[in-house]
Amino acid sequence: MSYTITAQTRTEIGKGSSRRLRHAGKVPAVIYGAGKEPVSIVFDHKDIINAQANDDFYTSVVTIVLDGKEVGVRAQAMQRHAFKPIIEHVDFVYA
């Protein structure tokens, strides 16, 4: 199964910025690896919560449409809230 997530590049970095994004229903994330510069991104929480419910999300290549350009990535790490069904941050690596 293929997964596609639409994301935007983050302009504000830091704890306060991340908290504001989470409060607005967004998920901060980062894409790194393959000798490229890390890219901070943000996307809607509903996009990732539905996709990650399937086990093959963690092993398959996820397509992120980042500012109109498609990027193939894999989920490396995911931080979740302690008791709420909320994803707080995702690390992706280039596929």
Swiss-Prot record:
GO terms for cellular component: cytosolic large ribosomal subunit. It comes from the Bacteria. InterPro entries: Rbsml_bL25/Gln-tRNA_synth_N (IPR020056), Ribosomal_bL25/Gln-tRNA_synth (IPR011035), Ribosomal_bL25_long (IPR001021), Ribosomal_bL25_short (IPR020055), Ribosomal_L25_dom (IPR029751), Ribosomal_uL5_bac-type (IPR020930). Pfam families: Ribosomal_L25p (PF01386). GO terms for biological process: translation. Signal peptide: none annotated. The keyword Ribosomal protein applies. The keyword Ribonucleoprotein applies. GO terms for molecular function: 5S rRNA binding; structural constituent of ribosome. Gene3D superfamilies: Ribosomal Protein L25, Chain P (2.40.240.10). Keywords: Ribonucleoprotein, Ribosomal protein, RNA-binding, rRNA-binding. Part of the 50S ribosomal subunit; part of the 5S rRNA/L5/L18/L25 subcomplex. Contacts the 5S rRNA. Binds to the 5S rRNA independently of L5 and L18. Belongs to the bacterial ribosomal protein bL25 family. This is one of the proteins that binds to the 5S RNA in the ribosome where it forms part of the central protuberance. NCBIfam families: bL25_bact_ctc, PRK05943.1. This is Large ribosomal subunit protein bL25. It comes from Shewanella oneidensis (strain ATCC 700550 / JCM 31522 / CIP 106686 / LMG 19005 / NCIMB 14063 / MR-1).
